[in-house]
């Protein structure tokens, strides 16, 4: 007589549908807090529906997607999962605001080998907080449990955001001209870029991430969530014709600022107009990193750069400070000769 074969289930293969359902129940309250009036229906459908907000004459949708890179590795190693969701939202919505777009809705993709409901709930709670800060609705997502694809407690995630801007109000850098002034908005730390180098510095310096650093642990300082600039900038746009914005992410100053400048213009940055936050000095010293490489990899304390007309500089600075931003005069736009570098940093870092 042949042996009876074992009856297999999806759970036997490593996929726990019940855990996925438990996660959905845990995050319903998070999703509800982010709801906008344009959102139609609730979570759980095959697709999410959202109307264009009233008041737009020629609405243009702006979409973006991003992740948080190897900052996740550090978060996983330190078992701190409640802030990387904020990072995920920030990386997307800060890219949208650069073009003048108001973020409307956000979706996330979360993938892991074995779903830990508590960890995933912490991550999604952070995503919800980021959406609240930016006024963006969390309308859906995908949780993928994929045994054999990720080791242990590892996970990865990606975010997808859509915003809207009036066609005549799109900010694309075409108005930038010599004489325009640069404004810096302070970052909260490394944000979500350069973490492969950060982790290398931690390795070669044998640094203790639990050691005190400026009143926090070193690990907490490095994992400080990316600052979200959406609401203050949307308010500024109502009063000032901002000519360009640059989100200082991977590639630092050298690569991000030229993305929003016409070929005939260059940004002259006053390198002594601000003090690098201590974490960047620590990274440079412990990694023996050149100043050029620092500006190429990290934001060095500047999370966003604005280009405004010269006669709007003081008004812009005053408004941004009133709105809670640490803002300062960073430099100016000058004419660039053919083939000339489009970013010049004058004066050393403090």
Swiss-Prot record:
Q: Name one GO biological process term.
A: 'de novo' IMP biosynthetic process
First-tier enzyme category under EC:
ligase
Write the record's keywords in alphabetical order, separated by commas. ATP-binding, Cytoplasm, Ligase, Nucleotide-binding, Purine biosynthesis
According to the lineage, what is the superkingdom? Bacteria
Output the Pfam families linked to this UniProt entry.
AIRS, AIRS_C
Output a single Gene Ontology CC term carried by this record: cytosol
Keyword Glycoprotein appears in the UniProt entry:
no
Where does it live in the cell? Cytoplasm
> Which residues lie in coiled coils?
none
- Family matches, as Gene3D superfamilies: PurM-like C-terminal domain (3.90.650.10), PurM-like, N-terminal domain (3.30.1330.10)
- Pathway it works in: Purine metabolism; IMP biosynthesis via de novo pathway; 5-amino-1-(5-phospho-D-ribosyl)imidazole from N(2)-formyl-N(1)-(5-phospho-D-ribosyl)glycinamide: step 2/2
Q: Name one GO molecular function term.
A: phosphoribosylformylglycinamidine cyclo-ligase activity
EC numbers, comma separated: 6.3.3.1
SUPFAM superfamilies of this UniProt entry?
PurM C-terminal domain-like, PurM N-terminal domain-like
Can you state which reaction this protein catalyses?
2-formamido-N(1)-(5-O-phospho-beta-D-ribosyl)acetamidine + ATP = 5-amino-1-(5-phospho-beta-D-ribosyl)imidazole + ADP + phosphate + H(+)
Among NCBIfam families, the record links this protein to: purM
Entry similarity comment: Belongs to the AIR synthase family.
Supply the name of the protein.
Phosphoribosylformylglycinamidine cyclo-ligase
The organism of origin for this protein: Pseudoalteromonas translucida (strain TAC 125)
Name of the gene encoding the protein in the UniProt record: purM
């Amino acid at each position: 007589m042949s042996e009876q074969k074992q009856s297999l289930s999806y759970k036997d293969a490593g996929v726990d549908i019940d855990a996925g359902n438990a996660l959905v129940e845990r995050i319903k309250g998070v999703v509800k807090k982010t709801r906008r009036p344009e959102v139609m229906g609730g979570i759980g459908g095959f697709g999410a529906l959202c109307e264009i907000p009233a008041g737009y004459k020629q609405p243009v949708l702006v979409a973006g997607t991003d992740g948080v890179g190897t900052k996740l590795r550090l978060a996983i190693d330190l078992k701190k999962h409640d802030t990387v969701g904020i990072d995920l939202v920030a990386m997307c919505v800060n890219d949208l605001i650069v073009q003048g777009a108001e973020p409307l809705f956000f979706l996330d993709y979360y993938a892991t080998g074995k779903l830990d409901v508590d960890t995933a709930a912490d991550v999604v709670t952070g995503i919800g907080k980021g959406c609240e800060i930016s006024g963006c609705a969390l309308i859906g997502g995908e949780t993928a449990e994929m045994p054999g694809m990720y080791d242990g407690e590892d996970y990865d995630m990606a975010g997808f955001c859509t915003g809207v801007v009036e066609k005549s109000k799109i900010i694309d850098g075409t108005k930038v001209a010599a004489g325009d002034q640069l404004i810096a908005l302070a970052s909260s730390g490394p944000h979500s870029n350069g973490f492969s180098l950060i982790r290398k510095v931690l390795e070669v310096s044998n640094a203790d991430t639990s050691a005190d650093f400026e009143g926090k642990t070193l690990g907490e300082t490095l994992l400080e969530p990316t600052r979200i600039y959406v609401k203050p900038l949307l308010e500024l746009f109502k009063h000032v014709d901002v000519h360009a914005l640059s989100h200082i992410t991977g590639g630092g100053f050298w690569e991000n600022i030229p993305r929003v400048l016409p070929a005939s213009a260059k940004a002259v940055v006053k390198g002594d107009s601000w003090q690098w936050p201590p974490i960047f000095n620590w990274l440079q010293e412990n990694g023996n990193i050149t100043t050029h490489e620092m500006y190429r990899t990290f934001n060095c304390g500047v999370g966003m750069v604005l280009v405004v007309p010269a006669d709007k500089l003081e008004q812009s600075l005053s408004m941004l400070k009133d709105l809670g931003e640490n803002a300062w005069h960073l430099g100016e736009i000058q004419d660039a000769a053919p083939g000339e570098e489009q970013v010049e940093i004058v004066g050393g870092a403090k």
